């Protein structure tokens, strides 16, 4: 057996040990690293194809984060008892890992690269997201794959007014910030964050502090490379035929400039495609038939390079964008609310040629989404789904399950609004938002944020403040010049160097996502992007407030009504009943949906108030505890010479002594009440030892309160002894008279076996 060489490096990060190890596992992968932080342990493997895929003109990188149930000591609960399709969390971590790695591969490198991250152990304290980025970067660095890493990643929180590095998972719930930053030693590559209205300065400081820790993690990866790194495989970037570009540029003259400066996307694309077809036809006309295909690719690539240069140079040199806007100008905005009948809330937000319809649906607490990530069962009362159909960009594409992009954009919009949602105790509804992108020319995710805020207010959801979002772009030049663009459209996104999305209220930032296509950006660029984004966000909020500035005072007539009551925890079983029989009966009788929390809160969801009141009455009847001074409409269930027994609650009787039946003296109980009568009675005493209840009809008739009775010296009559009830209903003296005198020598007869 060949002895393995195992290499390991460690460093203290935020009081916990980060360890990177290579050589123990997956020796046939091009690179494999186990990253451990606390007891969270991940294996990252990377494999690169030996040759570029034929006909590929893009970099085919795939990142898969594989959740394994054994990592938390669980067996999958499905029929096959094995892991299935990736969860939303797995997809989001895959995207989180992909984004900072992709810019660091060389341009023109078209070999397929696959990164697989497998969860070995999850300790429920240390978030595996940043660790996945670190593990993947380390595996790429020690491999022979061309990669300009390493990349460090860290999570930042904001607790007790202080920034915290790598807060534990249970601390995130109390943190005003959940931010992941990734970068090289020289620059920031990626930021993803949700926040509770932090200022731009606070957000930037979190990025700066996080990047400082990223540098330490990069140093650790470099130590591992020195121990076991492989020489990088040779790669020569494709040679650019500048002479062909010059020839095409000269032949087109200013036609390309005129084509790309059309403000309408469809017209711009049509003119650009027509010009490209002319260029291809002209520059392939003299080629032999067998060379036409290759020549067409070369001409197409040269044309697209000229198109990119035209757009970028116009911005850098002239400050002119393709649609004629200034660098900090936002496209025309139009807003409508309440556009869809019968739904609980709706809004259409249109910015330029990007249009998003967002629908709000309110449901009961039982409609919460059950989430089971690696055995951690939680529920979500707020859900946001983002749909990007092919017609939104004028394309034909198969419609199937949501793509990773759709899930990622929905998650960004979801976390951008989370900070302004009402507390569950004030608004117990489950909230589902669906953003339908009807037309897209860039920044559809931020349009979803705006549409969602408007739709929530239209639905009457008491959000704390309106939220708007805007996407910023960046154009850089080889001479160090750069320009930040506000509200980028599709072409600027595709040909630019950065996508910097910021969402928030007038007070502060609630959501942030930054992706770049270069090898990093500086703090100065980020500071400028934050400043322009704030100005743009406030402008959009003003436009939104012109249409609807606060939540509607009432919910839609089509929305369900939820009422909340509190019952004693020890009464939950009584409400549910054997096998759920009792609660099912209430639901069937009233048409209500009833959800019970472990702390005794009961949510009654009904289509109207009458059904809710009926359900509450039935629940209170089952769970209410009698108290001194309470008045009940009770039913007489038993009559005795000394008084009447009255049922006041299900399974709960009290006794009205003959002296408490009326204001005047009562000689015979049946002169006042009969079996089955319903009478109003007041609880005047509850025996602390036995729990037996004494009732008074007289107190109700006279209007006396327990305090007045006590002050007047009235005391509850002593209850009869136990043997006077049950099987021996008659008083002892009456029983003795009926039985007659006992004869001497009488003894109880022993029971026979067949009695």
UniProtKB/Swiss-Prot annotation:
Pfam families registered for this protein in UniProt: KH_1 (PF00013), PNPase (PF03726), RNase_PH (PF01138), RNase_PH_C (PF03725), S1 (PF00575)
Cofactor section: Mg(2+)
Ranges of Basic and acidic residues composition bias in the record: 719-755
GO BP: mRNA catabolic process; RNA catabolic process; RNA processing
Protein keywords: Cytoplasm, Magnesium, Metal-binding, Nucleotidyltransferase, RNA-binding, Transferase
Recorded GO MF terms: 3'-5'-RNA exonuclease activity; magnesium ion binding; polyribonucleotide nucleotidyltransferase activity; RNA binding
Region described as Disordered: spans on this chain: 699-755
Binding site for Mg(2+): 493, 499
EC number from the UniProt entry: 2.7.7.8
Flavoprotein found in the keyword field: no
Domain S1 motif, residue spans: 629-698
Ranges where the KH domain occurs: 560-619
NCBIfam families: polynuc_phos, PRK11824.1
PANTHER family (alphabetical): POLYRIBONUCLEOTIDE NUCLEOTIDYLTRANSFERASE, POLYRIBONUCLEOTIDE NUCLEOTIDYLTRANSFERASE 1, MITOCHONDRIAL
UniProt-recorded name of the protein: Polyribonucleotide nucleotidyltransferase
Organism: Chloroflexus aurantiacus (strain ATCC 29366 / DSM 635 / J-10-fl)
């Amino acid at each position: 057996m060949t002895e393995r060489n195992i290499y390991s490096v460690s460093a203290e990060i935020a009081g916990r040990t980060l360890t990177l190890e290579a050589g123990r596992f997956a020796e046939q992968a091009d690179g494999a690293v186990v990253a451990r932080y606390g007891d969270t342990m991940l294996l990252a493997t990377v494999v690169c194809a030996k040759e570029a895929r034929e006909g590929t003109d893009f970099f085919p990188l795939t990142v898969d984060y594989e959740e394994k149930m054994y990592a938390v000591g669980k067996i999958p609960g499905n029929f096959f008892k094995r892991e299935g399709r990736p969860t939303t969390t797995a997809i989001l971590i895959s995207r989180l890992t992909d984004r900072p790695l992709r810019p660091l591969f060389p341009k023109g490198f078209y070999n397929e690269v696959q990164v697989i991250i497998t969860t070995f152990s999850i300790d429920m304290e240390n978030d595996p997201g940043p660790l996945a980025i670190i593990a993947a970067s380390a595996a790429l660095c020690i491999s022979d794959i061309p990669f300009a890493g390493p990349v460090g990643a860290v999570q930042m929180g904001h607790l007790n007014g202080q920034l915290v590095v790598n807060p534990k998972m249970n601390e995130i719930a109390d943190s005003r910030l959940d931010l992941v930053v990734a970068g090289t030693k020289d620059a920031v590559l990626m930021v993803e964050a949700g926040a509770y209205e932090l200022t731009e300065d606070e957000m930037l400081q979190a990025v700066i502090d996080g990047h400082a820790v990223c540098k330490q993690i990069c140093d650790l990866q470099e130590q591992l490379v020195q121990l076991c790194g492989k020489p990088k495989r040779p790669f020569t970037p494709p040679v650019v035929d500048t002479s062909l570009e010059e020839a095409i540029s000269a032949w087109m003259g200013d036609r390309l400039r005129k084509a790309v400066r059309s403000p309408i996307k469809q017209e711009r694309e049509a003119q650009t495609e027509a010009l490209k077809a002319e260029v291809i036809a002209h520059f392939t006309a003299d080629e032999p038939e067998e060379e036409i295909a290759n020549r067409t690719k070369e001409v197409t690539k040269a044309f697209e390079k000229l198109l990119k240069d035209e757009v970028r140079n116009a911005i850098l040199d002239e400050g002119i964008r393709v649609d004629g806007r200034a660098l900090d100008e936002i496209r025309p905005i139009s807003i409508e609310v309440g556009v869809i009948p019968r739904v609980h809330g709706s809004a259409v937000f249109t910015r330029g040629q990007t249009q998003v319809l967002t629908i709000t649906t309110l449901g009961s607490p039982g409609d919460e989404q059950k989430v089971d990530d690696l055995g951690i069962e939680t529920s979500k009362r707020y859900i946001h789904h983002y749909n990007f159909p092919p017609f939104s960009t004028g394309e034909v594409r198969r419609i199937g399950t949501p793509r990773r992009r759709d899930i990622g954009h929905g998650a960004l919009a979801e976390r951008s609004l989370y900070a302004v949602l009402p507390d569950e105790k004030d608004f117990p509804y489950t909230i589902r938002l669906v953003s339908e992108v009807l037309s897209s020319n860039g920044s559809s995710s931020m349009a979803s944020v705006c549409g969602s805020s408007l739709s929530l207010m239209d639905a009457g959801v008491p959000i704390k403040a309106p939220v708007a979002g805007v996407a910023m772009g960046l154009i850089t030049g080889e001479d160090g010049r750069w320009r930040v663009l506000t509200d980028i459209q599709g072409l600027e996104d595709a040909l630019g160097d950065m996508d910097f999305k910021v969402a928030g209220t007038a007070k502060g930032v609630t959501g942030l996502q930054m992706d770049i296509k270069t090898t990093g950006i500086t703090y100065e660029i980020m500071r400028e992007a934050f400043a322009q984004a704030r100005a743009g966000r406030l402008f959009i909020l003003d436009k939104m407030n012109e249409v609807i500035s606060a939540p509607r005072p009432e919910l839609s007539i089509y929305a369900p009504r939820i009422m909340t009551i509190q019952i004693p925890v020890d009464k939950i079983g009584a409400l549910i009943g054997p096998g759920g029989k009792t609660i099912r009966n209430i639901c069937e009788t009233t048409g209500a949906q009833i959800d019970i929390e472990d702390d005794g809160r009961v949510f009654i969801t009904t289509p109207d108030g009458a059904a809710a009141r009926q359900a509450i009455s039935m629940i209170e009847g089952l769970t209410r505890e009698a108290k001194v001074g309470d008045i009940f409409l009770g039913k007489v269930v038993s009559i005795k010479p000394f008084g009447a027994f009255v049922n006041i609650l299900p399974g709960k009787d009290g006794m009205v002594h003959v002296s408490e039946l009326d204001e005047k003296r009562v000689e015979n109980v049946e002169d006042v009440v009969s079996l089955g009568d319903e009478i109003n009675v007041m609880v005047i005493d509850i025996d602390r030892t036995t729990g037996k209840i004494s009732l008074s009809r007289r107190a109700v008739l006279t209007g006396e309160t327990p305090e007045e009775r006590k002050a007047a010296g009235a005391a509850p009559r002593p209850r009869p002894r136990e043997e006077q009830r049950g099987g021996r209903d008659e008083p002892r003296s009456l029983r003795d008279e009926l039985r007659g005198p006992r004869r001497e020598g009488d003894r109880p007869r022993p029971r026979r076996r067949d009695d």
